[in-house]
Design a protein with these regions (language model features):
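A short acidic, helix-capping loop that chelates divalent metal ions and anchors anionic groups
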Residues: 73, 130-136
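Internal alpha/beta core interface subdomains
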Residues: 174-178
Length: 213
C-alpha cells in the first residue's frame, strides 16, 4: 500500500476534460495511488471507466482505489476500497473483500477517530486539514488535530483537504504517511507539472529529514 501521493477524482474537474488522458498525465507526474470517486455517473459508466483505469494503473504500477462502491472495486480487482460513515460499515466491507484489498476510512474529527481504532481498516483519511473548495460540506480539523490524530492511532493517516505543494512539508512533519489531493493536481491545466511539484515537495521533506539525522 503506497498512498504517498494520492489523487482523488471529482466530478467538477471532468466536465470538459478527458478522464483517462488526465489520469495518465498525473501518473507520469508521479502519483502513487488513484482513488476513483464520482457521484454523477451510472454504474455501467463507472465500471467501463474503471476497467480502462485498472489497465492503466497496472501498467505504471500505481494503486487503484474505488470510493464507496465495493461491488465495482471487486469487479475490476482494485487494490483498495475507500468508505465513509454513510457507506457500508467497514466490517461488512471486510467480509465482502476478504484480504483481496485494503480498506480506507474517512474521519473528520478526533472524537470519531477514537471510535474507529477497532475497525478492520488499513488506513484513515483525515481532514479537512486546510480550507478547501472541493467539498462544500467539509469540516475543518486543522494541522494541530492531525498531529494529535497521529499519536492516537496505530493506523497510517493520509491527510486530505486543501493540501498544496507548499503545505506538504507541514503535513508530513505532523506525521501523515501520505497526502490525498484533488485540486492541487486537477485544478491545473498542466496536470503533470502540478503532480511533479507535489512529488518534489514530498521527496524534499524526506531528503531533509535523512540529512538532518
Amino acid at each position: 500500500m503506497n498512498l504517498s501521493i494520492y489523487l482523488v477524482t471529482d466530478d467538477a474537474y471532468f466536465k470538459d476534460r478527458d478522464l483517462v488522458s488526465t489520469i495518465e498525465q498525473a501518473i507520469q507526474g508521479g502519483i502513487t495511488a488513484l482513488q476513483y470517486r464520482f457521484k454523477n455517473k451510472t454504474s455501467r459508466q463507472m465500471y467501463e471507466e474503471l476497467l480502462v483505469l485498472r489497465e492503466l494503473t497496472k501498467r505504471y504500477n500505481v494503486e487503484l482505489v474505488v470510493n464507496d462502491r465495493v461491488d465495482l472495486a471487486l469487479a475490476v480487482s482494485a487494490d483498495g476500497v475507500h468508505v465513509g460513515e454513510n457507506d457500508l460499515p467497514p466490517d461488512v466491507v471486510r467480509k465482502l473483500v476478504g484480504d483481496k484489498m485494503y480498506i480506507g476510512y474517512s474521519v473528520n474529527s478526533l472524537e470519531k477517530l477514537r471510535e474507529v481504532e477497532h475497525l478492520p481498516i488499513d488506513y484513515i483519511g483525515f481532514g479537512s486539514i486546510y480550507e478547501t473548495s472541493t467539498k462544500k460540506d467539509y469540516k475543518l480539523v486543522g494541522i494541530e488535530a492531525l498531529r494529535q490524530a497521529v499519536k492516537m492511532t496505530s493506523k497510517p493517516i493520509i491527510a486530505i483537504g486543501g493540501i498544496t505543494h507548499y503545505r506538504v512539508k507541514e503535513v508530513l512533519s505532523a506525521g501523515a504517511k501520505g497526502i490525498a489531493v484533488v485540486s492541487a493536481i486537477l485544478g491545473f491545466e498542466d496536470v503533470k507539472k502540478a503532480t511533479e511539484e507535489l512529488v518534489s515537495a514530498y521527496k524534499s521533506y524526506y531528503r531533509e529529514k535523512l540529512y538532518s539525522v
